[in-house]
Amino acid sequence: MLDVQSIIIYLGLAIILFFLAKYAELRKSSGAVWLIVILLSLISGLRADSVGIDTETYNTIFDLISKGVTKGIYGIEESFIYICRVLLGIWDNNQFLFLIFALISNGLIIFTIWDNRDNISFRWSVLSYYITFFTFSLNGMRQFLAVSIIVYATLFLKKGKYVKFIIFVLIASLFHRSAIIGVCYLLFEIIFVKYFESKRKLIIYLLVGIVVFFGIVATYGLVNYYSKYFEQQLSSMGIMMIVKAIMLIWSFGVIETPKNNQERYFCFSNRWYYFAGILLNSLNYIFVYMGRIGLYFYIFESIYIGNIFKAKNKTIWTLMFKFCYVCLLLYYLYNNITRGGQGELPYRFFWQI
């Protein structure tokens, strides 16, 4: 049975966000961008225990941290526990933590999209993010925080500020140790090295050598830590990632390649990040939860789709290609508000329980 409140909230928010993003795009209004972040964060941060697969678990964890009983907390980074303890010292309220974490994750991602507004359709990127990824802020909260920090760090990566990028990757790992995979973004720089000046090329070669060396050690540790997830196998395969991979390849034929070097770098880098995300996310069809590791790259689908809708409608194929993505987003939205999948239905605010 359909839940009316959930439909009003999720569908209504999709419409509001699209037109707010359109207003921000046309008026270059950072205030409208902040309003988008606040609306997303309120829905995520004010949710009840019943919304999201692990919200109740996090409530229990926050209660234990508040009481100083941290020995009974397993599988959570000590650094995350310390961060929660500091925040609870400001206001001993679990909902305060949910709201702060929602503001951080949604804020970093939305403002990363906003920073790329010259190369994308901001409204379509925001809508894509909301429909496809917003529910992750209701589940796997620590990892989604880490993902948002990595996504924001790519702004430094594209400017060649590699030290800042690495610092942000380390900060992200304080929330979720899997964030260390973010250093793999440096490996992609080898592919785009032709777009860089000589000094940046040299830095990249040195950094990649270091990343490969330490990455082997780190990967061994991570594989051991997450080996239990490889043991939980699925017997069925899906086709959505295959469809998305085909559409990504199709985009090279129907979307005009920019002539400006900087724009080409933006276009190709985002496509490669997204492609890596598709490949890694496909693990979810074989191993339960392992697809989440691909979220660090897969989330670039939002910027990729924004870039698609920014392209000029020079041929009927371009229009058809965009129409396919409209249908895809509508399909996801329909599933979100009628079936869920991340425990987001029925939506209730914390004061309603």
Specify the residue positions occupied by each region the protein language model found.
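Membrane-interface transmembrane helices that cradle and orient dolichyl/undecaprenyl
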Residues: 150-163
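Membrane-embedded alpha-helical segments of multi-pass membrane proteins
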Residues: 5-16, 35, 100-104, 141-149, ...
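Short hydrophobic/aromatic helix or loop-helix immediately within or flanking a transmembrane segment
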Residues: 56-64, 70-92
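Transmembrane-helix signature of polytopic, membrane-embedded enzymes
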Residues: 27-28, 110-131
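Alpha-helical transmembrane segments and terminal signal-anchor/GPI-anchor hydrophobic tails
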Residues: 49-51, 55-60, 64-65, 81, ...
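Membrane-embedded helix bundles of polyisoprenyl
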Residues: 122-140, 144-149
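Start-transfer (signal-anchor) and selected internal transmembrane alpha helices
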Residues: 1-40
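Transmembrane-embedded, aromatic-rich helix segments that form part
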Residues: 165-167, 178-189
